[in-house]
Amino acid sequence: HSLVGSEMCIRDSLFTDAEKVVAVMRSDLGKMINKGAMDNGFYIPATGVAGGMRNITNSKRPIKTVADLKGLKMRTPPIDVTIRTFKALGANPQQVAYTETYMALKTKVVDGQENPFSNAVDMKFYEAQKYLSVVNWQVHPDPFYVNPAWYNSLTDDLKAIFDAVSEATMIYSDTIWLNSEVGYLNILKDKLEVNFMDPKDRDGFVTGVKGVWQYYVDQGYFSWDEINKALAIAGK
């Protein structure tokens, strides 16, 4: 439960854009959640985003509605929430190592993959894909972990400085990440057929994964109250 911040930020289809995720992570709720990591032996002074929103490429068809995912062999990382999500949405998730994803796409072992625009460009996934569907389904957090014993050895003045610098650095990192995504998307527009999912059709993702949300609530990772507070902060 103490790692609820990371779990909530990658929660499938919970937020519609990375800026809303950032708003939650920088809020009092986000800071309170980070403090809970102390129970697991971590101190987190700040959390950012590891790239932009994750979107879907594939070689079969544009993803305009949830129904278009049905039967697609989707490469996923070995992350439980990702696997559960694509199963819930009707796809056939296949765990493939990140470094082996390009070859898996090229040899048709999988039909598609999900990653931020930057990864799709840097790893040249577009060479083995035909469609990019901008669905903004998930974002991965980038928590800055430090040893609590080390942190607690600092004077109060040094703790304050460390916390302030950590937060400022993470804000700078987020700005660089999110600004760069626009350029990466423009590159992909020249390589792939791009479609942007209509907001009303994206609601199908939200409906389709509510059972996944409930699973993690039942497991004690977070509560519906925390989810609703996060959505209120994000203004969804």
Residue map of PLM features:
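Single conserved hydrophobic/aromatic residue that forms the stacking wall/gate
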Residues: 1-5, 9-10
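An extracytoplasmic/periplasmic, membrane-proximal ligand-sensing/linker region
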Residues: 31, 163-167, 171-236
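Extracytoplasmic
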Residues: 6, 51, 69, 139-141
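Small-molecule pocket liners
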Residues: 11-13, 18-22, 52-56, 140-144, ...
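Short, solvent-exposed loop/beta-turn-alpha elements that line the ligand-binding surface or hinge
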Residues: 16-41, 67, 199-202
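Bilobed "Venus flytrap"/periplasmic-binding protein-like clamshell domains
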Residues: 31, 35-111, 119-122, 175-178, ...
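Pocket-lining segment of extracytoplasmic ligand-binding domains
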Residues: 81-83, 92-176
